[in-house]
Amino acid sequence: MNNRIKSLALLVNLGIYGVAFPLSAAETATDDKNSAAEETMVVTAAEQNLQAPGVSTITADEIRKRPPARDVSEIIRTMPGVNLTGNSTSGQRGNNRQIDIRGMGPENTLILIDGKPVTSRNSVRLGWRGERDTRGDTSWVPPEMIERIEVIRGPAAARYGNGAAGGVVNIITKKTGDEWHGSWNTYMNAPEHKDEGSTKRTNFSLSGPLGGDFSFRLFGNLDKTQADAWDINQGHQSERTGIYADTLPAGREGVKNKNIDGLVRWEFAPMQSLEFEAGYSRQGNLYAGDTQNTNTNDLVKENYGKETNRLYRNTYSVTWNGARDNGVTTSNWAQYERPRNSRKGEGLAGGTEGIFNSNQFSDIDLSDVMLHSEVSIPFDYLVNQNLTLGSEWNQQRMKDNASNTQALSGGEIPGYDSTGRSPYSQAEIFSLFAENNMELTDTTMLTPALRFDHHSIVGNNWSPSLNLSQGLWDDFTLKMGIARAYKAPSLYQTNPNYILYSKGQGCYASKDGCYLQGNDDLKAETSINKEIGLEFKRDGWLAGVTWFRNDYRNKIEAGYAPVYQNNKGTDLYQWENVPKAVVEGLEGTLNVPVSETVNWTNNITYMLQSKNKKTGDRLSIIPEYTLNSTLSWQVRDDVSLQSTFTWYGKQEPKKYNYKGQPVTGSEKNEVSPYSILGLSATWDVTKYVSLTGGVDNVFDKRHWRAGNAQTTGGATGTMYGAGAETYNESGRTWYLSVNTHF
């Protein structure tokens, strides 16, 4: 099968390129095609007229010409300021990389679908180092069902509230219409190397009128990615001795994904509509052998290739959108999201944390309810203005039958039972916000905003922001912003019944055993986000540079000092706030209209600093710089070619281990700069059928996982740290996509 996919992809590429090159002297692409190509890095505003420097858009056409395999994060990562990384610098679950915006980590990236938050990853427990065994929340919508993706960075994201300190990814789906439309799409790839998992995906959509004022949309999806071979990293692992001598760091796990979603729209009055939507998704992993500490036991070996965790997600929402002749618009919605995280039993103590201790499944049930209402009012008082007022209420409730079960093996914690602790936790957030877009002159837009959040556990937070867009001469625009962003602690971090135990290895400053306990006295994380950008636009040319700095306060981590010691000498640590951290960098953009049919788009991100001011250690392990370049050629109306190039800079590991000691030996390993080249071709065979074939990583620049970042072990054996070498990068991969629609 893989050879057939390679052959088909190669034939599509050769055939289209063969047609293309003889036509190079006669470029006949339409203006519409040109504008579509130029949308690659169009900077938009977050639901308003403000043109912020930290907003980028990925269009449906770009997704069609560069279809992602596992997850749309593969294409989101090509936006300025975006990378993929783990929840922490530990390297644990190193191949479960998620979207990191401006070095603030995945926990500070808010994922939205059609403007509504997605929270299923919150049903996965936090490990001692802050990791979650999760695939993130960017795979709930099939790529072919996406109209566009907005990536919002910096101060512009603060209006979205909790969890948006790094930025926001808003996945916007294709809508209903007055005419019947349908599609069937399929995607398959074939890695050059047999030890890498392949992907197959198929999905459909159907939309149209139901009669009267009603219309509907329905889509469904099936996809499967095989797990990497259990020994994919053999020969590349860091040194392992004793009982760990025969263990290997795992590759990327596979996944089986099923989605179905239905929406009915009722236009019950002029400029007024109600939408009723329901969706069901099921994601099951195909286990590749990973454990939190890259160790093994008989259950690890037995479960390779099987499902060991299943995430079920049910969503129900009602949305009322309205407008009036005077320009006033309203948006009101209610959403109920019900993720159920079902997984095999895992250890919660020391070296056995995250490794299977049972083949029995236990459930973690998360219930998330959100109510949202906002109104936008245009008016003319001194200057043209557009005032937005809104409110939100969010409740999260969790029943965790899996993670609150660690016995107090190291002795008592006053007030808490060794067994039978409550599996329940919950929190509510009530929010009010106001934003005013003020057109001071034809070239000056000022946007002040204020958001208030009250969290039932951590209390009040105020998030003011101010953004300015100032035209300079005909072609230059100065863009500036400052905002106070906010993130509430998770239900695990605030739950005193969530307790982890270590006999000493996991303890920061203790030689003997220690506990880590949830802390209901935490403060919310905040960040003062600032950016200044200068942009030039003329005749299709776009050039810009943006400086950003996030002064991060009260980041939540496992504690550095014990708060109590019991009569057995066991220290008690809690989740605590780190006083200060800072992230700073530069983003650059250059788009060149080479000709009427050739467009060259580029962006670069350069990180100046990312550190915990208390310890000086790094906040996340991301490249020093990332360059993304795309060359698109619309050969003729029905044929387009594309090359993509990404260059990742050096990646440096943590400076200190989990005990606060400077890293040594292989713990200091860096990832050297490397680059990835991709080629693709798209042919619109008919009005209703298109083919895309391509190859990722043309020069087969592979990267292997060597282990976790830090050394662990004891008298019976040692697993030496791998520094920054904690993930796999796939080699050369051929792919073919068929899209049909009517």
Which residue stretches match the model-derived regions?
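Outer membrane beta-barrel strand-and-loop segments of large Gram-negative receptors
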Residues: 368-377, 421-425, 431, 519-523, ...
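C-terminal beta-signal and adjacent terminal beta-strands/loops
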Residues: 119-122, 553, 647-656, 682-742
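Periplasmic-side early beta-strands and strand-to-turn transitions of outer-membrane beta-barrels
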Residues: 178-303, 554, 650
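Short, acidic, small-residue-rich periplasmic hinge/interaction motif at the N-terminus
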Residues: 25-65, 106, 114
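A beta-strand signature from Gram-negative outer-membrane beta-barrel systems
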Residues: 133-185
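Surface-exposed extracellular loop regions of Gram-negative outer-membrane beta-barrel proteins
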Residues: 284, 456-458, 475-530, 547-573, ...
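Extracytoplasmic beta-strand/coil segments of soluble accessory domains associated
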Residues: 73-121
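Gram-negative outer-membrane beta-barrel transporters
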Residues: 185, 439-445, 547-552, 568-658, ...
